[in-house]
């Protein structure tokens, strides 16, 4: 499978027609498993934001997208922006993405502890939380007094906590370095809404927000 057309140009300027032309029976030639990773489970880009709503496993998309995403039933609030039209696979639930990722990582840790507990491993776990849109799973809706985005932050805390518990459960915690990081500061509209609605500043005590050169930005 490739994301380039016959002329070698990236398929990114023709709406959904280009996505509909993808041959999902073919492998992804430049997938992470061909770039040093033993296993991969994830998405092409942000899992609740961009065009192709389907999971990649290894170098394949086992359940290809077959329809257009229906955004009508999705949450509609100041933190639900950044969710674009796109092709979606059957059973792909935008509000449960992080719990799917969590189960995959827990399964990896369990399997590693059985097969080679003394062998070093590298697990790169990318959450959707707390990137917009803030689609907290049903389990976490209303868990905080800070609205949908606060619930999404709560879900991220839960995911991190569950991964830490898994390390401890499988005897991996004492010899594992855990790094929690972000690629940038909080999104501008999110910060504005959270400040106005809940007196919460996602970058506090640092200056700036996403796209700023200050320590709270990029």
Regions found by a protein language model. Give the residues of each.
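Short, solvent-exposed turn/loop segments enriched in Gly/Ser/Thr/Pro and often Arg
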Residues: 1-7, 40-48, 122-133, 180-188, ...
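Active-site His/acidic residue clusters
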Residues: 50-60, 105-152, 187, 193-196
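Short, well-ordered amphipathic alpha-helical segments that serve as non-catalytic structural scaffolds
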Residues: 104-105, 156-165
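The substrate-binding groove and active-site-proximal loops of carbohydrate-active enzymes
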Residues: 86-99, 142-155
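Catalytic-adjacent loop/helix segments of enzymes that bind and process anionic phosphate/sulfate esters
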Residues: 10-23, 89-123
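Histidine-centered active-site microenvironments of extracellular/periplasmic hydrolases
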Residues: 18-25, 32-33, 132-135, 139-152, ...
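Sec-exported extracytoplasmic/periplasmic mature domains
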Residues: 42, 110-114, 161, 165-172
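Catalytic-site neighborhoods of secreted/periplasmic enzymes
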Residues: 1-87
């Amino acid at each position: 499978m490739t994301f380039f057309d016959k002329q070698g140009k990236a398929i990114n300027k023709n709406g959904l027609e280009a996505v509909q032309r993808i041959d999902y029976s073919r492998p992804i030639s430049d997938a992470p498993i061909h770039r040093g990773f033993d296993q991969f489970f994830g998405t092409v880009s942000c899992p609740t934001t961009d065009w192709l709503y389907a999971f990649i496993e290894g170098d394949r998309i086992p359940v290809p997208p077959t329809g257009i995403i229906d955004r009508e039933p999705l949450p509609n609030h100041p933190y639900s922006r950044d969710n674009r039209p796109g092709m979606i696979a059957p059973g792909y639930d935008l509000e449960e993405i992080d719990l799917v990722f969590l189960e995959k990582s827990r399964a990896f840790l369990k399997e590693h502890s059985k097969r080679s507990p003394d062998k070093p491993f590298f697990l790169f776990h990318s959450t959707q939380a707390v990137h917009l849109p803030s689609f907290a799973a049903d389990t976490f809706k209303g868990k905080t007094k800070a609205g949908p985005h606060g619930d999404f932050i709560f879900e991220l805390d839960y995911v991190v906590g569950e991964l830490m518990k898994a390390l401890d459960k499988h005897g991996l915690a004492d010899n594992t370095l855990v790094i929690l990081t972000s690629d940038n500061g909080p999104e501008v509209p999110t910060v504005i809404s959270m400040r106005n609605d809940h007196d919460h500043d996602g970058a506090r005590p640092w200056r700036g927000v996403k796209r700023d050169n200050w320590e709270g930005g990029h």
